[in-house]
């Protein structure tokens, strides 16, 4: 990153096209390739087929540069029947490398801006801010005191050109934007990369990083309204364009529609100091201490605002108003509830004593077992009832590879669901994976499960006892002799940057 700082000089006012040359640098694609191979894979390693792709990076870059200097560069035949070719090469392989390189390039200015922000705030551990688990301690602290919550399902995918226009306000590099527009328009399966799927979005596995970046960037843009409302709730006065994250035209639209009317009559609706908002991909939660009437006003305001100013078609039925006391939040693979915890207090006076019953609110996070079994069933580890099955497609692997794959799946699930209040659901998942592993090995060796386990011994169990569990018991076993208290111990980690594939059952 220091090399990027020296090359880019971090001065966009003097250098507006610093991103464009990076697209034709080989080390950018090598960096993207290494990121792809080193990412956390929960089910199986799918990167072996790409090990030789670095050998053709130079050929790809040379071809792109050659096309740029031709008069008919980037011209495609409209009646070309070969839809599996891209710039004369295989679509899957080259598009994966191109979009991987694009993802690295477009993330550079945003990452540098984040570093400057953290330096100004004297925060050096930026990686801690990326952890998904960091959301849940925030929910524990804030949501216990709130009343209503809005479950928001983000609108259907937007038009490609709107994404490009939104990106223009941050990346002032016309050449890069034109090249990006070309690749996205010419990519033959663009419409299948971002498609509505229940309450979330489905992305191409190969190009997931790049399209997640574009999607999250656009969503963050229309989330900037919360910055505006947060400032207005604390002081009713004119605000600078910086509050709108450099959206000058956006600021003018708001100024014409809002500030020219009776300002106080409109803004009082949003003077709510207890308003909290969290989002992950296609699902968001907006919680408040206000009344049901206030939440309804929030609901229809957001729908109209997103449709009018960001062309995000959203229907009111995609936003549900629920009361936290009798509603469970389905968010990030956890089932979160706010329950009343009874508490008896004994008050002693001079001659008399009183027992006072009191109840406090507590935010609980649980692992939903039914959707998790559904995910395991889709992956062919068990049937819909949760009965373990063998994995025939893995029977051709070696015994050590089979055991390692099953063990890796459980270790990742155990790591992700370490914050669950009750571990019984996790123990059931452990049982399913262990028996599925045993049946897969028995199927491979044409034996019964009982005979195979008797011959294998305890070696199979070691892969399913995670390092986190060992540290967990060594740390807390001495501090608490009550097994029930140890059973409900929750641990949040700061190194989880993506939701587990099996946990993403939406």
From Swiss-Prot:
MF annotations from Gene Ontology: RNA binding
Similarity comment: Belongs to the intron maturase 2 family. MatK subfamily.
PANTHER family in the cross-refs: MATURASE K
Gene Ontology CC: one annotated term: chloroplast
TM helices/strands, residue ranges: none
Organism: Rhododendron hippophaeoides (Rhododendron)
Protein name listed in UniProt: Maturase K
Coiled coil (residue ranges): none
InterPro entries, sorted: Domain_X, Maturase_MatK, Maturase_MatK_N
Cellular localization per UniProt: Plastid, Chloroplast
UniProt keyword list: Chloroplast, mRNA processing, Plastid, RNA-binding, tRNA processing
């Amino acid at each position: 990153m220091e090399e990027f700082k020296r090359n880019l000089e971090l001065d966009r006012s003097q250098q507006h096209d610093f991103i464009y040359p990076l697209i034709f640098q080989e080390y950018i694609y090598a960096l993207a390739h290494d990121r792809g191979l080193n990412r956390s894979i929960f089910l199986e390693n799918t990167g072996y087929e790409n090990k030789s792709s670095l050998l053709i990076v130079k050929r790809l870059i040379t071809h792109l540069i050659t096309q740029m200097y031709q008069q008919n560069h980037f011209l495609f035949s409209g009646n070309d029947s070969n839809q599996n070719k891209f710039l004369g090469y295989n679509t899957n392989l080259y598009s994966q490398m191109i979009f991987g390189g694009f993802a690295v390039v477009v993330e550079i200015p945003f990452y540098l801006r984040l570093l400057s922000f953290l330096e100004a705030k004297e925060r050096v551990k930026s990686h801690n801010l990326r952890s998904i688990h960091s959301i849940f301690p925030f929910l524990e602290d804030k949501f216990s005191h709130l009343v209503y919550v809005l479950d928001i399902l983000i609108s259907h995918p937007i038009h490609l050109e709107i994404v490009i226009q939104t990106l223009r306000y941050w990346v002032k590099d016309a050449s890069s934007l034109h090249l990006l527009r070309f690749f996205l328009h010419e990519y033959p399966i663009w419409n299948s990369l971002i498609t509505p799927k229940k309450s979330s979005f489905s992305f191409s596995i190969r190009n997931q990083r790049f399209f997640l970046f574009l999607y999250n960037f656009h969503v963050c843009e229309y989330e900037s309204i919360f910055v505006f409302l947060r400032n207005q709730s604390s002081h009713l006065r004119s605000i600078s364009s910086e509050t709108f994250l450099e959206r000058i035209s956006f600021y003018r639209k708001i100024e014409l529609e809002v500030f020219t009317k009776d300002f106080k009559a409109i803004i009082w609706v949003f003077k709510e100091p207890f308003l909290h908002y969290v989002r992950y991909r296609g699902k968001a939660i907006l919680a408040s201490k206000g009344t049901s009437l206030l939440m309804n006003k929030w609901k229809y305001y957001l729908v109209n605002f997103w449709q009018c100013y960001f062309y995000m078609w959203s229907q009111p039925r995609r936003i549900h108003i629920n009361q936290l006391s009798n509603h469970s939040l389905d968010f990030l693979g956890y089932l979160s509830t706010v329950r009343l915890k009874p508490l008896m207090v004994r008050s002693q006076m001079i001659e008399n004593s009183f027992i006072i019953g009191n109840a406090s609110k507590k935010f609980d996070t649980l692992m939903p077992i039914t959707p998790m079994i559904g995910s395991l069933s889709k992956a062919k580890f068990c049937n819909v009832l949760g009965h373990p099955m063998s994995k025939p497609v893995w029977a051709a692997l070696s015994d050590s590879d089979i055991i390692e794959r099953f063990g890796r799946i459980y270790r990742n699930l155990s790591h992700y669901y370490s914050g669950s209040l009750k571990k019984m659901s996790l123990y059931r998942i452990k049982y399913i994976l262990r028996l599925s592993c045993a049946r897969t090995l028995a199927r491979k060796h044409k034996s019964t499960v009982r005979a195979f386990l008797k011959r294998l011994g305890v070696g199979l169990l070691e892969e399913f006892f995670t390092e986190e569990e060992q540290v967990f018991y060594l740390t807390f076993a001495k501090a608490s002799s009550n097994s029930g208290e140890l059973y409900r111990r929750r641990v949040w980690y700061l190194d989880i940057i993506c939701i587990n594939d099996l946990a993403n059952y939406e």
